[in-house]
Amino acid sequence: MTDSNDDKTISVAGKKTLTLKPSGMSQGTVRQDMGRGRTKAVVVETRKRRPMRPEDEKPITPVAPAAPVRAAEPAPAPVQARPQQPTPAPRVQQGNNNQTNQRPPQQSHQPPRQNDRPRPVVLNHLSPEEMDARRRALADSQARDAQDAIRRAEEEKRRAAEEVIRKAAEAEEAARRAAEEAIRQAEAPAVAEPAAAEPAPAEARTDAPRPPQPASSAPAARRPDAAGAPAARPAPGAAVPGAVRGRRDEKEEDDRGAARGGPVRGRVVRPEPAKPVTTRPKTDEERRRGKLTITTANVDGEDNARGRSLSAMRRRQEKFRRGQMQETREKISREVVLPETITIQELSQRMSERAVDVIKYLMKEGQMMKPGDVIDADLAEIIAGEFGHTVRRVSESDVELGIFNVSDEDGELVSRPPVVTIMGHVDHGKTSLLDAIRHANVVSGEAGGITQHIGAYQVEQNGQKITFIDTPGHAAFTAMRARGAQATDIAILVVAADDSVMPQTIESINHAKAAGVPIIVAINKVDKHEADPQKVRNQLLQHEVFVESMGGEVLDVEVSAKTGKNLDKLLEAILLQAEILDLKANANRTAEGTVIEAQLDRGRGSVATVLVQKGTLRPGQIIVAGDVWGRVRALVTDKGDHVKEAGPATPVEVLGLSGTPQAGDKFAVVESESRAREISEYRQRLARDKAAARQSGQRGSLEQMMMQRQSVGIKEFPLVIKGDVQGSIEAIAGALEKLGTDEVRARIVHSGAGGITESDISLAEASNAAIIGFNVRANTQARQFAEREGIEIRYYNIIYDLVDDVKAAMSGLLSPERRETFIGNAEILEVFNITKVGKVAGCRVVEGKVERGAGVRLIRNDVVVHEGKLKTLKRFKDEVSEVPMGQECGMAFENYEDMRAGDVIECFRVEHITRTL
């Protein structure tokens, strides 16, 4: 604080901010208060925003240099609004007692204070660069002032429109609050007396529209004294006149009383004609209410005229109105669709609830979650029920609804050809029988004379069509036979009359019974001399197949594929059985069926042999088969003819799929590519999840961990298998898996349908695997790549040879068997200690013979104490290779000398024998 009161002057003319400036201080310097009466002149560069002053107002004249403190009393009209304002002499004293950062400007003619330190000299001459900088700053300030003027004009227009809306709302509220107005009218005389001295007209708060103002007029209407607060309120640290303060306290008390039963603070009060108003004409500060100054920034508490915006007041008014009306909203119950998993945020949006409310409910239930957390459908259903909504559960599998297993009406069903599967043991003549029926020669084109693919054909008998499915009879093709039995209506069990019932015959019977299809027994090869059909019938009885000739219900026909005997009777039996079954299907619907076989053709791409079971398949339609989809490019029959459509029970080859489906997959026609892609992606994701679950289960299960620990020492034979069709690859993988033992097993690194490519060679090189091609070949680039890298490629067309070669190769990985052969025993008679040799045992051969270099065991009291090899074997002084029984010899062990008389030396030979699987 300073000790002198003469070095300051207070300027209250107009609405200028009170500042303190030393004498002689030029523009751009600021007096900084250092505390305890110390000051410091600081040269600064400031950017001032000059408010736009209306043209009709005159600029505020500076205070006369020699004027005393009382000279500041004459003020503009807004300041003279309160005649009871006392002399400002106490304000000077108060200003000396309360230090602030803003001091009144100091007149230049006054002498410097004695207590001030020497001020730094500020040069009045500026350099050209500084002048340019000031000019630029002045130009920027003028541009900003122009923008502020435009912005203020727009704000005034907006607030004028808001004022009209506000007054309309106030008029509505006035009708509901007539009782409170009567109370305020009764109190009006008491309030009007202290306000009568002020020159402000009472009509200032009438409903007449006011001119737009930069600052909100709502606070002015709420507190009349606040409108002129920046002008009437003394500077920080000055004394407030008692009369003004008392009147303001009374007014604030009045407002608080009205807030209890009327509008809350911050809201605009309705026009009240009977209530005296103490407002003053708007001053320059009110017009610049929207501009932030030091004075307005320091204003806080209830005197702040810019407490809230019109939007905030409207919100509070609306909130208060809702509270007065006490309207209860009716709860809207919605149907919430819940997938298998959903986030809390998504659930709240579907319920049209706040996520915070859902989080609060979960916290009450003891679960701390965030809006982004994922919950299952059960918990989501509980939450939705708690909030009063209904739930409809859906899952990802719903994308397949309406595609498979669609029921047909009885009126739409028509007769269809029967689907017949030929099953039986290998080499019992299944394919030959089908060739005889089709008048074709498929057997001659098969490698090894055995069927290794599943084939579908259609023949016509007496104007009726019959669809045949030929399955392999080899033991490796169990899955193919099972698929054939599932897709068929009638199963023909082919049994050779000279070979009778065999293992695959029994398996075929079980597949047919599991599929629930009727069986027709075809006893083949009856033209042979050793044929015995009755033996076949008797053996079938052991497996619960009772033929008609034995009192059963199963049809049996003796046929010969070679001579064509009784083939017509077999076809008649098939048609008779089909008539009994009354096979029907709906041809006027989207197609649905089963994939019989699939392969990757080099020229045609992915080719799938399908059996249409329902509907009609046409080119151009979009189908989904397993996890692949595509648009049908062409339909090819078993004879190679292109057809325009394929009805129920018709086997065709489909071209145009995006990939090679698995044999046995269901296919169906969908309406759009997007639907097909969605189903395909869902099935692929499901397959990945299952694979991941299997891997995680293997890692987590204790039993699996023990098995993995045991399998650490198992040797693996890595293979890359490429085949012509998916069924063959499946059969090869199953056959190789059965070859595995506890010591060695085949590991299939990769398998697929199609030719051998360079990527297969690269994979085999990385995994050190051999490549097996079944009925496929490697292209030129792949073959050259394999030769450079030394990768072995083996080609096979018969599954027997493939399995035998892999079995032999895996046998080479087995450790050889160690076999011991007993040679003889010798008893130690005496032990001699010979220099440079060590201990030598004098022995007599009591059984067999003793050979040098053979393995020996030293047995003492029937306990083996040492096992090793003979270091020397002598008879007398000569080294010998062997000593027969009954003779004496001298023996010494390698790295062992603890020999005693009476010990027995057992001599044996070790042989390593190669093992096979």
From Swiss-Prot:
Pull one GO CC term from this UniProt entry.
cytosol
> Major place of localization?
cytoplasm
Compositional bias (Basic and acidic residues) at which positions?
127-184, 246-258
**Annotated protein name in UniProt:** Translation initiation factor IF-2
Organism source for this protein? Rhizobium johnstonii (strain DSM 114642 / LMG 32736 / 3841) (Rhizobium leguminosarum bv. viciae)
Q: Where is the composition biased (Low complexity)?
A: 63-113, 185-203, 215-244
Question: Which residues are listed for GTP binding in this entry?
Answer: 424-431, 470-474, 524-527
Annotated region described as G3, given as residue ranges? 470-473
- Region annotated Disordered sits at 1-304
Location(s), subcellular: Cytoplasm
The record's gene field reads: infB
